[in-house]
Amino acid sequence: MTTWQGWHRFATTDPPAPPQPDAPPRSRDERLAYHSAFVTIRTPAIHTLVTQVRTLMILGRHQQTTARPSLIVTGPAAAGKTTALLHVGRACHLAHTRKNPAPPGSAHAVVPVAYVLVPPGATAKTLVTEFARYLSIPIAARMTQTQITDAVCHTYTAAGVQLVMIDEIHRLNPRTTTGAQTADLIKDLTERLPATFVYAGINVTDTPLFTGVRGAQLAGRATLITCGPLPARHGTRHPFRDVITDIENALDLTHHKPGTL
């Protein structure tokens, strides 16, 4: 999914559908394939992220002078951060392409969303190269970081990218020279691209990402959304029980008794 072709295929492929009461039973192989992919359960974090992204994208259209506000999705490993990110990205992609379809006969597809992974040991040049790879921007061996960045900003703006999602952001360490340069690159991109940025990473508040001058710049523009343990009760709602109920309703098991999970 870290290329436009891969992302487009993901976003436009129908997600797994839970079994319907009037549908014929699925085969064992079909049920195994379904549970392997499974449905996305709409957790409180996903609900919050969807609402916040929609709001920031609307606000960002009217902000021209400085970097737009951003979001950071944080939490422990395997807490659903990437799942939340991909769910929101797909929703944004589908909503935008419905409202703004490519003109008939156009060779240029609408590109509303970009998804980039921070590579291990990322430098500013390797990260901006990942941005270039997403849209298949030609990169010559002798191109400098500045030249690649200029090409990325020009192409992303021309393609109409509105949402940039950067995953594995915890891999950045602004206390190191390379980490500081990479953080500066991200700041530069947020100021030059007319897009909303959403980051995801493991427990980012416990990392150097939020400390020091560069960390303060990033944190100062970002709203934190935590993917953590679900509370048993929140006001009049029961988030943990609600999620378990949604999971159970989505199961396709032949001998499972509803209500026992």
Annotate each PLM feature.
Residues 1-69:
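A short, basic N-terminal segment
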Residues 73:
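Hydrophobic anchor at the beta1->P-loop junction of P-loop NTPases
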Residues 81:
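Conserved lysine of the Walker
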Residues 84, 88:
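Hydrophobic positions on the alpha1 helix immediately C-terminal to the Walker A/P-loop
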Residues 91-103, 137-139:
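Post-Walker A helix-loop "phosphate-sensing" segment adjacent to the P-loop in P-loop NTPases
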Residues 111-140:
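Conserved NTP-binding/hydrolysis module of P-loop NTPases
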Residues 155-178:
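Conserved P-loop NTPase "ATPase switch" module shared by AAA+ and STAND
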Residues 171-175, 185-260:
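The catalytic "switch" region of P-loop NTPases
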